[in-house]
């Protein structure tokens, strides 16, 4: 797409879910995530702090998961209904939508139990003052995994983290793996992780949860491991030592551990919060739009913000 646009004298701007959550979406010139042109130089953001005002708080958009699910069902239904008219269309999703819905439905039926289990794990961690690291999973078909990471799958990322943790993390620490809230459940990551943990002799040091209050878990964690999830920004907000195993917009000295994963467990340091605030303010002002893709109110807010952003880019 970019070469075609360039050949015709057109600039490309890309929409994506927000880097900053909640209440924001991303609109960025050229590309997003691993294709973002945001600098990775800490000194650059510190210098920009002099001319960048504090980022405004996002106003609630009215977003809810049911609205998102409604649009997804309409989208999947249209794909199925009109499939014969577009025989060459290929989705980025690996499975038929309604097959994925079966997995989501099964997971939804177990959601109350998932919340009880995660609450029990959280109490177990906090009541005992247990040292632990948190590893939030991402979606297996997400371009963040498929394109912008060194892994072919989430299972491969789990294997990398568990193997390193077993050999190099403090012996008294635990690893908490938190599944993605929108995971379909068609790949049993819990079974995969627990089986590998047994093989590595660390089964008693692993906790896998399908729910849980992420801010609480981050607030008490010794550190966080992500591939390149937006949870990384949340970890920085909570002043947690962080390593990003893939390409991330926040992957720079002062925000993330720049050494190996093996060394992270013992030697990682808390982020530079002045740098984090400088980075966050710049990102909000230059890449984020207050709004969402799914609700009437959120779309109206996003449209107005996008028009202002694009008009400003036109006159720049």
Task: Kindly label every feature range from the protein language model.
Residues 1, 12, 16, 210-256:
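A donor-sugar binding/catalytic signature common to diverse glycosyltransferases
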Residues 36-83, 255-316:
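Leloir-type glycosyltransferase catalytic cores
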Residues 2, 6, 169, 236:
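Anion (oxyanion) recognition and catalysis
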Residues 30-33, 193-195, 243-244, 261-262:
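Short, hinge-like loop/turn segments at secondary-structure boundaries
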